[in-house]
Each structure stands twice: as C-alpha cells, then as structure tokens.
Amino acid sequence: MFKVFSQVAFQKVCVGAILSGSFLAGLVSDARAQQTGEARSVFAADYQKKLAAVVGSNNEVQWTIGIRDIHDVQHLSDGHWLLQTSFGNVVEVDAEGKEVWRYEAGKTERGGPIEIHAFRRLENGLTMIAESGAARIIEVDRDKKIVHSIPLSVPNPDAHRDTRLVRPTPNGNYLVAHEALGVAREYDRTGKTVWEYNVGSKLYSAVRLKNGNTLIGTGDGHRVIEVSPEKEILWQIQEKELAGVQLAWITMVDRLENGNTWIVNCHAGPENPQVLEVTPGKKVVWSFKDFDRFGNALPVAIPYQR
C-alpha cells in the first residue's frame, strides 16, 4: 500500500515507501505553490523530487505518493488513479492510496529491457500499455492477459526512446509520439500507419482534437503546435513567444473545454512556471510553479477534479 497523507500529516512526515526495493524517500516542504489566475487543483509528478501529489486550489497538498520515475497518469471516473512509480510498471490505486491492480513490464523476445511511458484505461475496461523496447502497444485485461497487440514501426527499438505518450483516437486508432524518430504517427489496429507528422524534435505528446487537428508537445523543440490532417501548422507557441515565460521541454499538452491549451513546461528552471494555461490568442491566463515540493523534472501534470 502506498503512503497517502492528509495535509496535516503531510507537514509532519517524510514521504516515501518501499516498493520492490527501489522506492525512494524524500523530505517534502510545506511551502505553498505559486498560482496565477483562477486557482485550481492540480495533480503533478516530478522524478527529481520523487513525488506525485495533488495540490489543491488553496495550494495545500491533499495527498501524495512517492515515485521513482513517471511519464503518464490518468484519473479514472471512479476516483482511482492509473499511474506509475517507475518506467517498469503501471499501478492502479484507489482514492485512499491502496493498490488494486499492477502490471509489470517483462522482457523482449530477445531478453532485452522494456520500459513503459504511456498507458490508458480504455472505455471497454482494458488497459492500453505502450511497451518501448518491444515496439508495440498492448491491451490487457484485469488478469493482465494480452487481448490485443499492435506492432509499431520502429527500425531500432530502444526501451527508453521508442515512445512517449500514446493516446487513443475517436476512430479506435492510436496516436503515438515517437521520441527517437521525432514523429507523431497514427496507427490502425493492425499496426498500419494511416497518418504521420515529422516534428523534427524529441516530441513527448500528440493529442487528436475534436476538430480533427493534432496538438503536439514537441519536447526539446521548445514549442506547441497544432497541425491539420493535411499537415499544415495552424497554430503554435514558440519558445519565447509568451510574455515572461520561456518554454523548455514541452511534455503534456491538451485542449481544455474552454478552448485554452494546457502546457507542461519541464526543465525550464525556477524562473518559469511548470504548468501553463494559454488562450488561443497566446495569453497566459493561469500558471503553476512550485520548486519547493517539486523540482526541475516535472513532466506530468493534469487538472484535478474530485
């Protein structure tokens, strides 16, 4: 069971637990996060401080879990969390932090390493897991049986660099951010490439929007781009285009219901916010910065609602 703390307990304890001999502990400050704009609750995870936490709209920590590495998260409709504590697993925990399901990565057919950098609980109850090193997407049931497997086109598989985020599309395909290849690629369920866009940098994320365009977090490309099905850039934010903000390694991106864009700005240093909300007109209307609890390696952040 994970250690999950209330705000009172959080201020008194050292966060961490022992998980398969590799869980790391760290003392976490009770200093307040800095938010600009309308305050909101945020799930954020940083592998420098070894911490995943929900920070409330009052900037107080609601709960926390110790981690080693993390590149993805999903808040499920029943209040559970699908996350990871290392690149070798996917873990589901309930709202109290109790582990209810776990998937551990194995080895490739040749005995090589496999890392996990993306996962999703699907509407049919299966769990999608992208296996880097094995160069495939698998869908597994609660018993961890592979129900479906999709091969990915990766010339030289690399456990750490094959993929970053993978997201399902409305038509049942998968949109894959291939970090090493610098390509966002859509695969059908047989593994056939049906669309791709050459980003030209170590991209982290690609999300298919309701309008059919694709929103891409370009990683070390230091920008966010929205491209059409015809591969035309329709909207973008460049590295130094936002007033008072420099974009660094762009990880998670999403289009919010209000039409604004969610941007996670990793490795940007304490002079810059770690998370931003930006209007179509490129105005920053909300930001989050916390270099006390978190560090300069915060790739994962999503809005949080109970």
Spans of features found by a protein language model:
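N-terminal secretory signal peptides that target proteins for export/translocation
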Residues: M1-F10
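Generic secretory/membrane-interface signal
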Residues: F5-S6, S20, L24, G182
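Bacterial N-terminal signal peptides
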Residues: K12-G26
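Histidine-/acidic-rich catalytic cores in large beta-rich domains
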Residues: Q34-R306
